Amino acid sequence: MFKKVDKKASREKRHLRVRKKVFGTAERPRLSVFKSEKNIYAQVIDDINGVTLVAASSLEKDFAAKGGNKEGAKLVGELVAKKAIEKGIDVVVFDRGGYIYHGRIQELAQAAREAGLKF
């Protein structure tokens, strides 16, 4: 018989493997992404001090019906980049959170790059 693959557990294992290598500092913080079925979240984190510097999500007021789809991810990417640049952060390390670089994750990353973040 075939075992059923637990996708969430696989993603969490991938995320731990990636997190061993991806580390955010004050000069180059980590842009972390999390997605649920209905929403997408992004935050810029300084891992040395354990502080979230900037955060944006599709739950904010500007996102009426564009929650967790590609358009919503693009808006979240633009918003997190805009907030980061306002705080003087222009270079980050991208942490895809164990997700495949495809779809909503890719849209968020491309929008953040177009808005001025470098990674």
Swiss-Prot record:
GO terms for molecular function: 5S rRNA binding; structural constituent of ribosome. The keyword rRNA-binding applies. InterPro entries: Ribosomal_uL18_bac-type, Ribosomal_uL18_bac/euk. GO terms for cellular component: cytosolic large ribosomal subunit. It comes from the Bacteria. One of its GO terms (biological process) is translation. Pfam families: Ribosomal_L18p. Keywords: Ribonucleoprotein, Ribosomal protein, RNA-binding, rRNA-binding. HAMAP family: Ribosomal_uL18_B. Belongs to the universal ribosomal protein uL18 family. Part of the 50S ribosomal subunit; part of the 5S rRNA/L5/L18/L25 subcomplex. Contacts the 5S and 23S rRNAs. PANTHER family: 39S RIBOSOMAL PROTEIN L18, MITOCHONDRIAL, LARGE RIBOSOMAL SUBUNIT PROTEIN UL18M. This is one of the proteins that bind and probably mediate the attachment of the 5S RNA into the large ribosomal subunit, where it forms part of the central protuberance. This is Large ribosomal subunit protein uL18. It comes from Clostridium beijerinckii (strain ATCC 51743 / NCIMB 8052).
